[in-house]
Each structure stands twice: as C-alpha cells, then as structure tokens.
C-alpha cells in the first residue's frame, strides 16, 4: 500500500503553480488604508497591479494592537522591503481612512528607502450615505 500524502500540501492535481516573477518597476503607487482596527499597505505598479502588500495583522499583531501606529510602521516597512526586491524606488502615496497609522506609515515608507513623491488623501466622503452607528456611552 502506498504511503498517504498529507492533505493540503502542494498544488492540486492538474493545477499549475504560479512562480512569483521578479517585476522591474522603478515607479509605483503606495495605497495606505488605515481603519480604526487595522492598517493595510499595498504597493502597486502604475497600472494598479499589486507588487507587494502587508498589514498590521499580517506582520503579527492581533486585536487592538493592530490599530496602533507602531503596527502600521512595521507593516509599511515590510511592504516597502518586498517592493524594493521588485525594483521599486519611487512611490506616490494614496491614503484612505481615519485610522491612527496614516502618518506613521508614510514616514516609515520614506525611512525604508523609498522616495515619496505626491501624497494624496483619497478617503471617500459620503454625500449623506448610510446612517452612522449610534453614539458610544462609556
């Protein structure tokens, strides 16, 4: 009897594995989505294809620590390091959301060695959209 293969390891039968190819993109865009609970940093090429990403949760923080500026800093550094492997040197930054990690993430992108060009806030503004949640009583 042949030995059993562990379930969930490797590609399924008839499925091609996608090797991660090294893209050479000198200029890209960094999208920072900072919510009250998490910060997600995505670095894309000019067409919008994702080159690298990282989030506070992906870096290893859980619960309320994901929303801290330090977690956003580590996420931005992680994404910048991955993007630099693909040749990214200059980024335009697009910030979205009201979270606490906005400025910290931009600063850590600069500290990681990426040259930051334009910084723009693309937070969506409702034209009286959905009803907001009720006020907290603490």
Swiss-Prot record:
Native source species: Mycobacterium marinum (strain ATCC BAA-535 / M)
InterPro entries reported for this sequence: Ribosomal_uS11 (IPR001971), Ribosomal_uS11_bac-type (IPR019981), Ribosomal_uS11_CS (IPR018102), Ribosomal_uS11_sf (IPR036967)
Gene name of the record: rpsK
Ranges where the record places region Disordered: 1-29, 117-138
The protein's name: Small ribosomal subunit protein uS11
Gene3D superfamilies, alphabetized: Ribosomal protein S11
UniProt family annotation: Belongs to the universal ribosomal protein uS11 family.
A biological-process GO annotation: translation
HAMAP family associated with the record: Ribosomal_uS11
């Amino acid at each position: 009897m042949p030995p059993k293969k562990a379930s969930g390891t490797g590609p399924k039968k008839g499925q091609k594995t996608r090797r991660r190819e090294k893209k050479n993109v000198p200029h890209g865009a960094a999208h920072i989505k900072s919510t009250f609970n998490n910060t997600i940093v995505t670095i894309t090429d000019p067409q919008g294809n994702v080159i690298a990403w990282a989030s506070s949760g992906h870096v290893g923080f859980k619960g309320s620590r994901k929303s801290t500026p330090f977690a956003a800093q580590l996420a931005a550094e992680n994404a910048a390091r991955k993007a630099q492997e693909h040749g990214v040197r200059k980024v335009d930054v697009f910030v979205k959301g009201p979270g606490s990690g906005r400025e910290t993430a931009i600063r850590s992108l600069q500290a990681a060695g990426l040259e930051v060009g334009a910084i723009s806030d693309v937070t969506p503004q409702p034209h009286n959209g959905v009803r907001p949640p009720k006020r907290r009583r603490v």
